[in-house]
Amino acid sequence: MYSFLFTKMHGLGNSYIYVDLFRETLPEEDLPAIARSVADVHTGIGSDGLILICPSEQAPVKMRIFNSDGSEGKNCGNGLRCVAKYAYEHGIVRDRSFLIETLSGLVEAEVTVENGEVTSVTIDMGEPRLRRSAIPMTGPEAEQVVAESFAIDGREYEITAVSMGNPHVIFYVDDIEKAPVTTLGPVVEKDARFPEGVNVEFVEVVSERELHFRVWERGSGVTQACGTGACAAVVASVLNGKTARGVETVVHLAGGDLTITWGHDGKVRMTGPAETVCTGVYYYRGGQNG
């Protein structure tokens, strides 16, 4: 058994346990099991996974993310906002605009501060990756996947696929409250046409500036919010002519709202809140709670 300090934070209800590796040390081989342990609502803390705030050779800070099933992810928009808040409020960075390293590359964060507290964060998520090979999805490597027919479980759907450093597939629905998140989501997540799995998004278009959104996250299942997924939904909606490029779009997630723009410079920018829930000491007992 050993213990470590943690902070629980959330972005629109998408909650993770954050461990500051500027101050703590965790064995690399234990990280998947620790993620499963802290995520458990009965024997752990309860969260969508584990995020490590790490030193970096490329930026002031690095983010590593482990899903609730122990798998390591490449990117997390809500996690990035929380990492930015933590890094600024704990003195890891002093500038209000700074880089964060992720497994999918460097991203720029800009914090809005009131009375020393970060109240919102804007993340430059970079350019979406649209080639089929970059998502990745099987089929002609150079093609985009826009309004493509997709057969599964004996039914035909229309999908658009986007990578924001992690894979997303978007289904449009007429009523977000009736979206088959828990039935279609897990089936599509593990479909062989997505060799690395995929995050599954359901989107209802309200107007050119407003979307309703629900998500089945790869490795975590239903979550309250997914920042990269909301970005992918806006990109997909522009590609399908449902929203406009360079216009702020409000995305209503189960946990709250994000404002997202796919700019004419090619970059996707996301603005939203980040909240600290609690801090404490976690006692990790290996197999007993991992």
Swiss-Prot record:
Q: Where in the cell is it found?
A: Cytoplasm
Query: What pathway annotation does it carry?
Result: Amino-acid biosynthesis; L-lysine biosynthesis via DAP pathway; DL-2,6-diaminopimelate from LL-2,6-diaminopimelate: step 1/1
Q: What class of enzyme is it?
A: isomerase
Per the record, the GO terms for biological process are: lysine biosynthetic process via diaminopimelate
Q: Name one GO cellular component term.
A: cytosol
Which catalysed reactions does the entry list for this protein?
(2S,6S)-2,6-diaminopimelate = meso-2,6-diaminopimelate
Keywords, alphabetical: Amino-acid biosynthesis, Cytoplasm, Isomerase, Lysine biosynthesis
Q: What is this protein called?
A: Diaminopimelate epimerase
Species: Geobacillus thermodenitrificans (strain NG80-2)
